[in-house]
Amino acid sequence: MRTSRECGRFAPTRRTIAVVVVAILVITLAVIAALLLPRPFEPAHAEEVQGGLDHPWDIGFSDDGRMLVTERIGRVRVYASGEPGAGLLHTATIPDVRTELESGLMGIAVHGDAVFICASRDTGNDWNVELLRSTLAADGSLSPFEAVPIGEMTGAARHQGCALEVDASEHLWLSVGDANLPRGENAAQDSDRLNGKVLRVELDGSIPADNPFGNAVYSLGHRNPQGLAFAPGGAVWEVEHGTDENDEINLLEPGGNYGYPCFTGADAAGPIPDVCGRASDYLAPAWASGSPTLATSGAAFLIGSGWGDWEGDLIVSTLKEEDLRRFTLNAGELTLEQTLFDRRFGRLRATVMGPDASLYLSTANGSDDRILRVTR
């Protein structure tokens, strides 16, 4: 029979038991403290407005406050308002939308009872980007969408752009990506082609008399412009994805050439001697990310006294970095001031001012996506 001394080699001593108990208590208290500690201070508040969406791309509001949301799979959802849990009034499904990688139903703009959308469509003959128009009825229903003819825009699985806005002069602005066409094809530098451009047309698709090239093109040399925003004074700002460097924010000028594929940021994107001119031929961005890129997407200027000293600042959403970036604007110069909601909600795409002076965002995580409302 083993003695108690022999068994003691395997039996825990009182000191061992005490150490274990203390360690468990320390770990438990640390976990409880972590759970009770508040989140790092956020200077803005976000709440969910709608959930359960499938790749929501953009958000628009009617004059009476109804909220319209595009889903990339080809749906437009009409809600009674931008309030949390507002009722769904209507869902419209757009035929022939081609959903592949980045393509599908994208931008939306609402002006009066007119609803404009930008979609990548394949009717079996051609794959194109199209501008479509519908009428919003009092009950929230939408008439069948019809194409607004503005010219051929090549569709593709990547680089569609498709930001839409209507300005105070009732011009419709549409950004169109370069469709990932070969750089040697130089679509973004060809003012006779609509890919790789920001377009400006009348609401019926006709060409404004003061457009710089006599067609729909307002500016050129863009890669994948997914954000358009009007500053309080009316200036138009554009946000686009770079390659592996230099996402850009540009102040648009009529006829302005923003460089792609020849120059991005302040640097050459690579020698293409047959299509590239001098660096001085191109307009430098107001801001560029350098390397790495952030995947900048939607953009909006903050309007309303509720934003305090942020009023007039530019907010840009990012997909890859999963946050918002706040920029101040002084004498035409942008300064990155702050990062908001860092990786709190995942990928962020749409950034839209609502009629209540709140900021509305869409997530782009691929499952159970949401619309968020941000206030300060």
What are these regions (language model features)?
Residues G85-G112:
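Blade-loop segments of beta-propeller domains
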Residues N128-V166:
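Asp-box/WD-like beta-propeller blade repeats and closely related beta-sheet repeat scaffolds
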Residues E48-D54, A92-E100, V148-A156, A216-G221, ...:
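Surface loop/turn motifs at the tips and blade-to-blade linkers of beta-strand repeat domains
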Residues E48-G74, L294-L302:
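Beta-strand-rich domains and repeat architectures in extracellular enzymes and scaffolds
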Residues L68-A92:
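Beta-propeller domains
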Residues V69-E71, I117-C118, L174-V176, E238-V239, ...:
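Residue position within the beta-strands of beta-propeller blades
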Residues F61-D64, V110-D113, V166-E170, F230-G233, ...:
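Residue-level detector of Asp-centered blade-edge/turn motifs that repeat once per structural unit
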Residues S103-L105, D178-Q338, G346, D356-Y360, ...:
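Beta-propeller domain segments
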